[in-house]
Each structure stands twice: as C-alpha cells, then as structure tokens.
Amino acid sequence: MEVNILGVIAVALFILIPTSFLLILYVKTSAENKDN
C-alpha cells in the first residue's frame, strides 16, 4: 500500500493547527483567570 506524503501532511496540518490554536486559547484564558 502506497502512502501519499502530501495527504499525510495535509491531514497532520488539518489536525495540528486547530488543536494548537485551541490549546493557545485555553492557556491564555487560564492565565488570565489566574491573574484575577
């Protein structure tokens, strides 16, 4: 079975970008809550 590298990269980006964005937002909000 042949693995399409571009497909793997596309899926990785599709998964990593939103999760990292959510992670950053979560850390930001939790840090702000700690300051209060």
Curated annotation (Swiss-Prot):
Pfam families: PsbM. One of its GO terms (biological process) is photosynthesis, light reaction. It is found in: Plastid, Chloroplast thylakoid membrane. GO terms for cellular component: chloroplast thylakoid membrane; photosystem II. The chain crosses the membrane at residues 5-25. It is a single-pass membrane protein. The keyword Chloroplast applies. Coiled coil: none annotated. PSII is composed of 1 copy each of membrane proteins PsbA, PsbB, PsbC, PsbD, PsbE, PsbF, PsbH, PsbI, PsbJ, PsbK, PsbL, PsbM, PsbT, PsbY, PsbZ, Psb30/Ycf12, at least 3 peripheral proteins of the oxygen-evolving complex and a large number of cofactors. It forms dimeric complexes. This is Photosystem II reaction center protein M. It comes from Bigelowiella natans (Pedinomonas minutissima).
